[in-house]
Amino acid sequence: MLDFLIYPVSGVMKLWHLLLHNGLGLDDSLAWFISLFGLVITVRAIIAPFTWKMYKSGRLTAQIRPKRVAIAEEFKGRHDEDSIREMQQKYKDLNKEYGINPFAGCVPTLIQIPVILGLYQVLLLMARPEGGLENPVPRSIGFLSAEEVQSFLQGRVFNVPLPAYVTMPAEQLTFLGTTREDVLSFVLPLFIVAAVFTAFNMALSTYRNIQTNDYASNISNGMFKAFLWLAVLAPLFPLVLGLTGPFPTAIALYWVANNLWTFGQTAIMHYIIERNYPLTEEFKEHHAAQRATYREQQRKKRAFLWTRRKNRLMMILTPHRAAELHAQNAEMTRERTERIRAEKATKKEIATKRRAAERKINQQKMEEARRRRQARRAGDKSNGEQPETDATDPSGK
């Protein structure tokens, strides 16, 4: 279903291999080895401008957050169409003033996902051919011919075959002229390096998120917590997958090159962002106030949970007070539940009113756009009709 994704990746690898092997005369194995790094350079070079826009847009979006909050406060309690329209226009003008594109952060992800899927498809298809390594069925992969795929299968780096992986059956390793120990001694340092640079990348991303996280948003806080867990687990993926799964030496090399490049690119872009777009004092004060409010909410939540657990424990230790403690827990829970429900109901009511007003505004915009299209078509049609002219005789009479 995703076979079309292998074409751009295989095309890039083919061009690098042709340049290195046919153009510069490098050994076939060395050419394939360097082609993996060439693939990283090509993909990252294409994505880099979009990644920069994403970082810049993210920083500027954070910078204007106090101004957006001020606009929201200005229109608090006003849900009529005129107010919503005016508020939307102010948001739009603010984004335009700071040159912010709300969709800038989507492009790198939209590019990287198909590239990554295509990459692993190509490398796995090349390293694990149909029919097995002993009797591979000649076949082309994307833009790579069957002969090029076969030359890749015969490629070696430091005498370790590119298709070999740690969990490969012993007979296949013997067929490739290597052993599990040789493969492990080569790829283990690679997976460790990949894990280390993954940790560095996640640490930089975590630091950026800590600087600009929107503590007033439950969605943002939830994503930040999930990212913290991911930052802990992500460095383990190269080690676990590399040592237990069918991940060939070629993918280990790609992981190292990709993570090293990503770390360097992220560090450089972060430095430029900090130098050219430092966080303003207005944002720092707003962010500190948001964080203090969030921490106070979390402190109250922990105090509530701790008190409830303590009361439950005391019910066991002091049975004669069980009814009293149970009633206390029930009252605490009821008050907290009612407060949360009231807050949610208020937010829901406001959101419902705003959605209704925004729906009407969008319908009006669609109707205006439809009328403009009709007027444009009518104008094009009238311009296309030739006006009738009275015939005149040659004498001019």
Swiss-Prot record:
Residue ranges, compositional bias (Basic and acidic residues): 332-352, 358-370
Transmembrane segments: 30-50, 107-127, 183-203, 227-247, 253-273
Membrane topology: Multi-pass membrane protein
InterPro entries: YidC/ALB3/OXA1/COX18, YidC/Oxa/ALB_C, YidC_ALB_C
Sequence segments annotated as region (Disordered): 327-397
Keywords tagged on the record: Cell membrane, Chaperone, Membrane, Protein transport, Transmembrane, Transmembrane helix, Transport
GO CC terms of this entry: plasma membrane
Keyword Transmembrane tagged: yes
MF GO annotations: membrane insertase activity
Function (record text): Required for the insertion and/or proper folding and/or complex formation of integral membrane proteins into the membrane. Involved in integration of membrane proteins that insert both dependently and independently of the Sec translocase complex, as well as at least some lipoproteins. Aids folding of multispanning membrane proteins.
Name of the protein described by the UniProt record: Membrane protein insertase YidC
Lineage: Bacteria, Bacillati, Actinomycetota, Actinomycetes, Mycobacteriales
Gene behind the chain: yidC
